[in-house]
Curated annotation (Swiss-Prot):
JanA and janB regulate somatic sex differentiation. The keyword Translocase does not apply. The gene is janB. GO terms for biological process: cell differentiation; sex differentiation. Substrate binds at residues 42, 110-112. The keyword Cell inner membrane does not apply. The active site is at 69 (proton acceptor). InterPro entries: Janus, Janus_sf. One of its GO terms (molecular function) is protein histidine phosphatase activity. Pfam families: Ocnus. This is Sex-regulated protein janus-B.
Length: 140
């Protein structure tokens, strides 16, 4: 009888671990690290994490041809909030993406969110398979 009582506690013990290590953190892995458009774009460097797990974050790059960096942030929130993922802006700037010439230039700052670490942005882009062969220049 004691054995059955002990076994009944297993779901309560396993449930928190299952949630922490499967659903929430796996949803971070499903978020693409890079989404930028062709041509001249504004971009944001963003640290994303599951709500309550700020220690286990991931840095992503988002860029689009919009009027201001706030529009990019709004689209990031629309994409991530339904998944329970929080976003913290690390800074912004501009990206000139020339896929035909395999060149990318990263420069400038965001008036709204401040300057991003362009070297970190370059490293993320170079790690992404699409931009691995591109010549990426950084202007601080």
């Amino acid at each position: 009888m004691k054995m059955l009582k002990s076994l009944s506690l297993i779901p309560r013990i396993v449930s928190p671990f299952q949630k922490c290590y499967s659903t929430d953190l796996i949803s971070l892995v499903g978020v693409p690290r890079v989404k930028i458009s062709k041509g001249q774009n504004r971009y944001l460097l963003v640290n994303i994490h599951t709500h309550g797990f700020t220690k286990y974050g991931r840095v992503i790059v988002r860029g689009a041809d919009v009027d201001n960096h706030l529009a990019i942030f709004d689209s990031i929130l629309e994409e991530l909030e339904p998944e329970g993922i929080c976003a913290k802006i690390l800074g912004g700037g501009r990206i000139l993406n020339e896929p035909d010439n395999k060149k990318i230039k990263i420069y400038g700052t965001s008036r709204t969110f401040g300057g991003a670490d362009h070297t970190r942005t370059r490293n993320i882009l170079q790690a992404w398979t699409t931009y691995k062969d591109f010549k990426i220049t950084v202007k601080q």
